Amino acid sequence: MAKAVRKAFAADADNYDRARRKLVPCFDDFYRTALELLPFGADDRFELLDLGAGTGLLSAMIAEAFPNARLTLFDLTPEMLTIARQRLKPVGKRVKFVTADFAKAAPSKPYDAVVSALAIYHLPDSGKRHLFADIFKYLTPGGVFINADQVAGEDAAIDERAR
């Protein structure tokens, strides 16, 4: 599954951000809500891990809102991280990029926050359960996990009403 996901995102990396704005309902609210859930003050220093960071859209918003935050971006697709590097170039040494399958790779240190946007839903349910258990191992005491993602309703009728 990881190979198929990597291949699809590698092929679409250059168009991903434009498509995301069209495909994600309430795009601005979606990302702003994830940002606002971070329990830090604007001047706080903290370490953040972005799982499935893609082109770095959420991380760039976080870096701008929290100029003392240090960010690590994990993504499976080098082409997506190339775009993230360009986007986050102004952030300088506060950001680190790791090409890795976040479902299998473990970070080398604990983080004050772990975030993910539109990535974890690609995993099967068993993979999600395993990842969620691992994420709590990655967090410092009192750390937070924010998953901004798509979810399926209990049945097709509920999904249809949500659209």
Describe each region flagged by the PLM.
Residues 106-114:
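A short acidic, Gly/Pro-enriched loop at the edge of an enzyme's catalytic core
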Residues 146-163:
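Conserved class I S-adenosyl-L-methionine
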Residues 26-44:
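Conserved alpha-helix/loop element of class I SAM-dependent methyltransferases that forms part
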Residues 1-15:
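N-terminal, positively charged/glycine-rich alpha-helical extensions of SAM-dependent methyltransferases
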Residues 116-120, 148:
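Residues lining the SAM
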Residues 65, 121-123:
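A short His-aromatic
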Residues 49, 55-104:
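Class I SAM-dependent methyltransferase SAM/SAH-binding core
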Residues 129-141:
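A short glycine-rich, Lys/Arg-flanked "PGG" loop and its adjoining helix->strand segment in the class I
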